[in-house]
Amino acid sequence: MAEPRQEFEVMEDHAGTYGLGDRKDQGGYTMLQDQEGDTDAGLKESPLQTPTEDGSEEPGSETSDAKSTPTAEDVTAPLVDEGAPGEQAAAQPHTEIPEGTTAEEAGIGDTPSLEDEAAGHVTQEPESGKVVQEGFLREPGPPGLSHQLMSGMPGAPLLPEGPREATRQPSGTGPEDTEGGRHAPELLKHQLLGDLHQEGPPLKGAGGKERPGSKEEVDEDRDVDESSPQDSPPSKASPAQDGRPPQTAAREATSIPGFPAKGAIHLPVDFLSKVSTEIPASEPDGPSAGRAKGQDAPLEFTFHVEITPNVQKEQAHSEEHLGRAAFPGAPGEGPEARGPSLGEDTKEADLPESSEKQPAAAPRGKPVSRVPQLKARMVSKSKDGTGSDDKKAKTSTRSSAKTLKNRPCLSPKHPTPGSSDPLIQPSSPAVCPEPPSSPKYVSSVTPRTGSSGAKEMKLKGADGKTKIATPRGAAPPGQKGQANATRIPAKTPPAPKTPPSSATKQVQRRPPPAGPRSERGEPPKSGDRSGYSSPGSPGTPGSRSRTPSLPTPPTREPKKVAVVRTPPKSPSSAKSRLQTAPVPMPDLKNVKSKIGSTENLKHQPGGGKVQIINKKLDLSNVQSKCGSKDNIKHVPGGGSVQIVYKPVDLSKVTSKCGSLGNIHHKPGGGQVEVKSEKLDFKDRVQSKIGSLDNITHVPGGGNKKIETHKLTFRENAKAKTDHGAEIVYKSPVVSGDTSPRHLSNVSSTGSIDMVDSPQLATLADEVSASLAKQGL
């Protein structure tokens, strides 16, 4: 909600900075209002139309394609953002603030440099920015939307790229936002992102600079950005918050056309009323949603919509505007985050004022007007029986309690008095369960309640009812003093005291008021303290204490008295016990004597024990028995060393070995000699073989030689074979025949004789080859 507003305001600032002030005022807010009117019918329509124009105007889609690539991340980011549209949108806008100069106007001091950088970068690369923008505009909805998501979530990632790129992408995002308007679901994602809102303003501001020639696009972008911001998380978060279309928030933002984000801090009260008028009954939910974004309190808000819608609207808007004003730099938070935090701050700051200025401050400090009125009216209702005021107070209380989930705890305390208890109690139990999630509001609301309670108490001081109101008022101050629980007790006793003064009228009513008083007085102590002590679940403990406090309040007050009295008793009892303690002291001494350790204590220093140790040293006689007194003297090793020398003397054994000298040469001298002898044996064997040299060639040298011998025979055979060949022709050669035959006989192969000489030659060759192979 606040994001669109802040963005719009930022757009105004940027427009003024970039010379877009005219279009900003005319197209910015005017466009916002017009588009808000259009967006009332359908925020998405105007973005759709505008993107159509942008898309038609921009021919290129390259940048959009590049953007569509990161679109996956952007889509994932928007999906994540959809989970918590309001919160994530609030968180993202913060991250995006650096992206656009929007943060500047949001009130972030550093953003001016970002604006300068963005402006400088945009000025440096206006064409690239335009191309990116054109790409965004050109790209159809899904890629553009994804890029919008990209620019939304990536708003932070884009920042690293550079304010210039971030600005360009945001400016491009504006058109894509318009295209995103075409794609409603993606626009919703963009809305969740809320980055489009901020990026939209950069489009107007930095974008305006980047593409000065595309004023229509800038206007459309702004319009689309404004409308898309309206469509964007504000439309979702703000409907939950304000129940009204995000346009209302935009309109509220536009209602202050000259209201810059920085100047937004100053919001006129009339503006709140305007906002309230602009925000229909749907706004009641807004404050509650703004305070409890993810608490889904609209259901509870519906209960209270009847009575406090206007006040809540005004208050919610005032808180939202205050949030924007106080946190203009946090557009993402919007009135939701700002509303709560600023609302709390303004509430606390306005507590004195709210007590006095409750009518005017009421819109800003919802709890102030509601809670004090609830208290006063509730008191009057229970005691005066004023049905109308009580009903209003009740309804407002319910609404405020429900809307103010943290406030409900306060409201239950207020309703606790008398007859209003039954009606308010349901609201308090229903509302209180939720408050634990919003402890901040409780604290902020309580202070106002206290101030308003004081006022109401003063107003009712004239009547006996004021007495009852006074305890109630005291209880609300107790709420203020949740941190200061002591105040509650002090105020609580006055509460019972005041009713006694008006005992005549309220004798009968005193019991119920006393119950509520005790409930209020004590629950603030117990419940509020417990709740306050545990900020994580202050509402829940408060509601628990309140619920039981209703039945048990009377008992608690007496318990307080008893407890107060008991502490002094306990000290007295402790003193008596302490007195008794001295009596056992002598017993303890006796016990020590019984223990028989008194003497030991005296000797504890170890004097006697040490002497005993010395005596043990004197017992060295035992060592003398060992016959090693001398050795003991030489214990350091003297005697043992001598013994070592004796074994050295035992080297005679080595002499027996007859290798004393060799022992020194043990490294292998003698062994080497033995090896030499072995070599001799080998030589001898080889000599026997007659192949000592061949032994070196053992791998087959000797075999080869043997083969050579065979070869000699074979050579002869070969000669025979040659002869054989010749024999066929030279058969008459007898010597040739005989020699081969004899040779064949030597080989003892009669077949050779039978075989022809050529076959013998082949066989000889084969045999030689096989032998050679074997030898190898």
From Swiss-Prot:
Polyubiquitinated. Requires functional TRAF6 and may provoke SQSTM1-dependent degradation by the proteasome. The modification N6-acetyllysine is found at K480, K560, K594, K616, K625, K633, K646, K652, K656, K666, K678, K682, K704, K720. It is a peripheral membrane protein. The modification N-acetylalanine is found at A2. Residues 324-340, 529-549 have a biased composition (Low complexity). Transmembrane segments: none annotated. GO terms for molecular function: microtubule binding. It comes from the Eukaryota. Residues 1-26, 179-189, 207-216, 314-323, 344-356, 381-393, 455-466, 517-528 have a biased composition (Basic and acidic residues). Keywords: Acetylation, Cell membrane, Cell projection, Cytoplasm, Cytoskeleton, Isopeptide bond, Membrane, Methylation, Microtubule, Phosphoprotein, Repeat, Ubl conjugation. One of its GO terms (cellular component) is microtubule. The modification Phosphothreonine is found at T69, T71, T111, T470, T486, T492, T498, T540, T547, T552, T566, T738, T762. There is a cross-link at residues 44, 589, 594, 602, 616, 633, 646, 652, 656, 666, 678, 682, 688, 704, 710, 720 (Glycyl lysine isopeptide (Lys-Gly) (interchain with G-Cter in ubiquitin)). The modification N6,N6-dimethyllysine is found at K480, K646. It is found in: Cytoplasm, Cytosol; Cell membrane; Cytoplasm, Cytoskeleton; Cell projection, Axon. Promotes microtubule assembly and stability, and might be involved in the establishment and maintenance of neuronal polarity. The C-terminus binds axonal microtubules while the N-terminus binds neural plasma membrane components, suggesting that tau functions as a linker protein between both. Axonal polarity is predetermined by tau localization (in the neuronal cell) in the domain of the cell body defined by the centrosome. The short isoforms allow plasticity of the cytoskeleton whereas the longer isoforms may preferentially play a role in its stabilization. Interacts with MARK1, MARK2, MARK3 and MARK4. Interacts with SQSTM1 when polyubiquitinated. Interacts with PSMC2 through SQSTM1. Interacts with FKBP4. Binds to CSNK1D. Interacts with SGK1. Interacts with EPM2A; the interaction dephosphorylates MAPT at Ser-396. Interacts with PIN1. Interacts with LRRK2. Interacts with LRP1, leading to endocytosis; this interaction is reduced in the presence of LRPAP1/RAP. This is Microtubule-associated protein tau.
